[in-house]
Amino acid sequence: MADLLIELFSEEIPARMQAKAEADLLAALTGKLKEAGLAWKTAFAVSGPRRLTAVVEGLDARSADVREEKKGPKVGAPEQAIAGFLRGAGLTDISEASVVSDPKKGDFYVAYSTVPGRDAKDVIAEAVPAIIRDFHWPKSMRWGTGELRWVRPLQRIVCVLDGAVVPFEVGGITSGNETEGHRVHGRGPYTVTGWADYKSQLEGQGHVVLSRDDRRAAILGGIEKACAKAGLQWIEDKGLLEEVTGLAEWPVVVLGQMDPDFLDLPPEVITLSMRTHQKYFAATHAKTGKLAPNFILVANIAATDGGAKIAEGNARVLSARLSDARFFWEKDKATPLEVMGEKLKTIAFKEELGSLGDKVERVAALARELAPAVGADPGLAERAARLAKADLVSEMVGEFPELQGVMGRYYALAVGEDARVADAIRDHYKPQGPSDSVPTDPVSIAVALADKLDTLVGFWAIDEKPTGSKDPFALRRAALGVVRINLENGVRLKLSNAILKAPLAVRPVVKGGQSDSVRSAASKAIDALIDPTLLSFFADRLKQVLRDQGKRHDLIDAVFALGEDDLVLIVKRVEALAAFLATEDGATLLAGYRRAANILKAEEKKGALPDGLSVDPALIAKGPAAEQALWASLNETTAALEAPLKTEDFAGAMTALAGLRAPVDAFFEDVLVNDSDAKVRENRLALLIAVRGALHKVADFSRIEG
């Protein structure tokens, strides 16, 4: 057994690429070893700003010999067949082959050969250069006059097997056993013999924390210690934490202080400026929760003054950044949102759907239409929609696109707009992902729904729907947003009605003398709206939401098939249906339904089911008791369903359906549907149709699986 250490040492690797490169290196190396027939006990990899390291412990020193056999022709086969076999097997005479007997096939020739194993050293010397040459980076470069590509110039390659260098050369770099430590604290070089020695020297004299997990833990510990001492609470940012973990080999947390005067800027501006430009964490006062005039940086050096000069220098840089932000803030506040909004007319949204200004007009009209249904003031909803996109042309959003909507809210509040209007400007983009919250104020709900529905209807009108994994206009996210907004707020809105209001908002675009393509899209809007694929698209998103909650997708189909598109109502029906089917009555009635449905399906397939069949009570009265009992129960159930369905008492509706269970069972037990009397047969089929129809008042049971 042998131990292998490989290090690929380069200039700085972008932080975002390190984790994947670490995994890719390990996968490529173990893949090559496995392919060569070598086994090992453990294998792992680590990565950092300047190195990718892979370790394999307990590696076979040599792969096993492999015995191969090549089957040949039968004994006594023609000379031509035997000659071909000898050439293929590398034999000079047939006497070198073995004869194997098979009870069915008879005697035939077999050539055996042994492929000798290979030393691990030889396999590695061949595999590692190939891995380096074929390694995939999202972005790579060449340097000097060489042809080798790497993410940044590759400087050293360590390849040590059981303390000895595995010699090879790739891209002009010869493998060796020397590496470097921290640029300032322990550059080295260091001669290493294996993983234990490598780790000991680098994490000791070399001042390099090799593991990402260890660096992350060191950073978290440093942040918590610094904040506890200063009475602060850091604003957690997992994305930034991962990034700075990949920026420092020897992470040292430094707490800095900025000019408190900058706190008059919106906190989102300050924290985003820190994060985007400087990779700093922000902090709040632990007692008040308000943003503190502090920043937390992760240095790659342990300064002798405790980081005071580092903090001072970074404070100056941050001050310059925030001064720029203050300039944008003051300039934007001097421009009314209505004036900003005028510029949207010159910005294309989609050629066939006009400008962003056109979209704003449509959304404003649609928000007014939807407002009563969600309990919002129509005037406020329209006002918010007209201002919602204005900040897209602001200086601040130009610098920080992530602040779209957020800055619009601040600018609206600064001039005295209604707080509900301001909040809707910020929240109409929500939810922007599965973990994002949905708007909850009625005005925000109206504008958010209008914005998303306008986008969906527009792209359906121009036939640009998502296909496969491609969704360049984030239509799935928009539809999912509509679903979540409705469900999480209990909004009672029929999607078909809401969608059909969209053309009312599209028509003003046509009146505005827009291009032929815009008029064409508007004229197609009605057809697009009644396209069943749009409602099906929403159904798929609803399934996604409910599936994440552990609910069955087939029950959603069963309810949606009735033409129901009030999402809140669908969920209530699905929950009641799931509870009913979990009972013995529900499961048995479903089995009875399927039996009836199969009989009817077979008759329909044969064309033996006349149109307009209806039950003749007189014939029922002459039939068996079980038939009469089912007819009576069906009438009772149909009557009993009316009240609970009208009041949306779906549990009550299921209770009413349960009354059919025993009569349906008895009917199939005692009654022959396919009676010799044609009229009796048709009447019994009509009875089954009536049973099916009663169940379909609650859900399409044919869509239920299992």
From Swiss-Prot:
Keyword annotations of the record: Aminoacyl-tRNA synthetase, ATP-binding, Cytoplasm, Ligase, Nucleotide-binding, Protein biosynthesis
Quick one: where is this thing mainly located?
Answer: cytoplasm
Kindly list the GO CC terms recorded for this protein. cytosol
The record's annotation in PROSITE patterns points to: AA_TRNA_LIGASE_II_GLYAB
One GO BP on record is: glycyl-tRNA aminoacylation
Assembly, in brief, is:
Tetramer of two alpha and two beta subunits.
Q: What is this protein called?
A: Glycine--tRNA ligase beta subunit
- Provide the species name: Hyphomonas neptunium (strain ATCC 15444)
- Name of encoding gene: glyS
